């Protein structure tokens, strides 16, 4: 089947307390800051980020494999004894997804709080420590950070970097911030155990075509025409970048997912409940767009 349950990065709305789809995100241009700093005085590479609060969850620094500035560091690991009260182990990795022109050309990798970093972790077999919870609050750190909202933790960490002489640059930038269409809450990328539809899996009954292939086919065969025509580029760009669709939601309205679990984590899927009292139904509901598509 195409539907599976997996622990993956989702778009989490801390205000609505639910996952949302990529198409329910509204990007708002906001004033922000880009910070350039080192994890410690003896760390060899400076990184740039607009979210210093996530850096306590860093496990690697990624550089472009052809960037001559960092070639001698690739493959090495460094122990950071104290990054604002947190001990880090940071490995230097080479990844073609890194833009050598952005910031210092070195990217702090926080797999649990960025879809790009999560995919890097897949490619490089990196750990995924989570440092932010569903309420957009910090889950690790000393008392000055633990339990603080991400915006508060950001200020605390920046001040710590400044006091330690690690902050090298602070720039004003404009940034597209992901917000939830319904609540206006700022989206927090989080790893969650959810239900997904695989858009890249070959479907035997459809000639081993994927869902992406089937979504592309009627346009290539001229069976469907996009008007005006220039939106075709938008559609195909969206299709090429389409990731597996998260179809589970933490909302009270909608079709409840027809899945039950027992104490041994066995899964039963049917429209009717299984026999016996040792089964608990999945508390999530289906994305309303998925539900409407069933009709």
Kindly label every feature range from the protein language model:
Residues 184, 204-216:
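A preference for well-ordered globular domain cores
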Residues 2-135, 214-248, 289-290:
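NTP-handling and nucleic-acid-processing catalytic cores
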Residues 2-54, 149-153, 158, 169-201, ...:
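Active-site neighborhoods of enzyme catalytic cores
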Residues 71-75, 144-158, 163:
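A glycine-biased structural micro-motif
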């Amino acid at each position: 089947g195409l539907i599976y349950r997996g622990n993956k990065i989702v778009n989490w709305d801390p205000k609505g307390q639910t996952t949302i789809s990529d198409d329910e995100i509204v990007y708002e241009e906001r004033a922000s800051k880009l910070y350039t700093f080192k994890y410690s005085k003896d760390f060899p590479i400076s990184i740039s980020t607009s979210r210093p609060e996530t850096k306590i969850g860093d496990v690697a620094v990624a550089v472009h494999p052809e960037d001559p500035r960092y070639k001698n560091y690739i493959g090495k690991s460094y122990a950071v004894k104290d990054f604002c009260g947190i001990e880090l182990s940071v490995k230097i990795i080479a990844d073609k997804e890194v833009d050598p022109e952005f910031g210092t050309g070195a990217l702090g990798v926080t797999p649990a709080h960025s879809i790009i970093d999560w995919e890097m972790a897949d490619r490089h077999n990196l750990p995924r420590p989570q440092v932010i919870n569903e309420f957009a609050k910090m889950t690790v750190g000393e008392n000055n950070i633990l339990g603080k909202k991400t915006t508060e933790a950001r200020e605390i960490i920046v001040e710590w970097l400044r006091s330690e002489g690690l902050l090298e640059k602070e720039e004003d930038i404009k940034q597209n911030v992901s917000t939830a269409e319904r609540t206006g809450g700022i989206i927090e990328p989080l790893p969650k155990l959810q239900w997904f539809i695989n858009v890249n899996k070959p479907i035997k009954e459809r000639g081993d075509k994927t869902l992406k292939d089937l979504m592309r086919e009627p346009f290539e065969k001229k069976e469907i025409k996009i008007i005006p025509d220039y939106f075709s580029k938008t559609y195909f760009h969206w299709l090429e970048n389409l990731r597996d669709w998260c179809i589970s939601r933490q909302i009270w309205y909608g079709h409840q997912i027809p899945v039950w679990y027992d104490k041994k984590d066995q899964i039963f899927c049917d429209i009717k409940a299984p026999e016996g009292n040792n089964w608990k139904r999945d508390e999530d509901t289906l994305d309303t767009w998925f539900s409407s598509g069933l009709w």
